[in-house]
């Protein structure tokens, strides 16, 4: 069984995605869609180390776009390709119990607002859906014990889920072939990364921006019991290429 994290851009390539779904749990992002709606509402998207700063207004947009627009469109497209997809968010059924995330940048704590870390995963819920023949499609929201809803980075959510269900593989799809030493040169792909190497790659500046939560999610999943994680794009997944974390 594998956990696949996809971005909103995959909505235009669902036919290709359907080819690789087999005993899978999908977790989707939707960052560009969220930013687009925010800008139309006069809100400025802000990011710290690849994580969206989420105040109350931004959280409302995130909930609306991820749990509504992106999730339901992806489920509908997958079902049209013969995939028995079932959409839910991390709030539903206590799937993702979250707590406020604290982020330290240059030695100082940065308040990200309603950004959450996954504290606990309801693995039994996902396993029951898989046993019933469904492909769970998860929008990355979580809720605290007090009912506070949090925006959970999709890579982080996928990593936590992969570890909790002890998946054979976590696939983190992105728009590049994997972790690159030079972002402008696909030939500089780093094919293998050990979990203990992740911090060093960040400190050297090889891994920046949105790749930071991807590598950290891969590390978290492998250390929690997932056999391996792969960071790649859809072409790489179809062709068996990418960065393997194991």
Curated annotation (Swiss-Prot):
The record marks 5, 214 as: Transition state stabilizer. This is Acetylglutamate kinase. Belongs to the acetylglutamate kinase family. ArgB subfamily. GO terms for biological process: arginine biosynthetic process via ornithine; L-arginine biosynthetic process. It catalyses: N-acetyl-L-glutamate + ATP = N-acetyl-L-glutamyl 5-phosphate + ADP. It comes from the Archaea. The keyword ATP-binding applies. Its EC number is 2.7.2.8. Substrate binds at residues 30-31, 52, 151. Keywords: Amino-acid biosynthesis, Arginine biosynthesis, ATP-binding, Cytoplasm, Kinase, Nucleotide-binding, Transferase.
């Amino acid at each position: 069984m594998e956990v696949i994290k996809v971005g909103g851009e995959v909505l235009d390539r669902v036919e290709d995605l359907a080819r690789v779904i087999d005993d899978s749990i999908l977790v989707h992002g939707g960052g560009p869609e969220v930013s687009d709606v925010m800008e139309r509402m006069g809100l400025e998207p802000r990011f710290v180390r690849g994580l969206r700063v989420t105040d109350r207004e931004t959280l409302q947009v995130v909930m609306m776009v991820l749990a509504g627009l992106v999730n339901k469109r992806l489920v509908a497209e997958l079902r049209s390709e013969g995939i028995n997809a079932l959409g839910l968010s991390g709030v539903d059924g206590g799937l993702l119990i979250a707590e406020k995330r604290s982020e330290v940048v240059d030695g100082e704590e940065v308040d990200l607002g309603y950004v959450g870390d996954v504290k606990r995963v309801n693995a039994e819920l996902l396993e029951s859906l898989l046993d019933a023949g469904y492909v769970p499609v998860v929008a990355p929201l979580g809720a605290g014990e007090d009912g506070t809803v949090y925006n959970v980075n999709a890579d982080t959510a996928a990593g936590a889920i992969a570890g909790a269900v002890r998946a054979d593989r976590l696939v983190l799809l992105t728009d590049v072939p994997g972790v690159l030493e030079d972002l402008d040169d696909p030939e500089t792909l780093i094919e293998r990364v050990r979990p203990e190497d992740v911090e060093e790659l960040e400190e050297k500046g090889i891994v920046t921006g949105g790749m930071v939560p991807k590598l950290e999610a891969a590390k978290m999943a492998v250390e929690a019991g997932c056999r391996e994680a792969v960071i790649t794009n859809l072409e790489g997944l179809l062709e068996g290429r990418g960065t393997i974390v194991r």
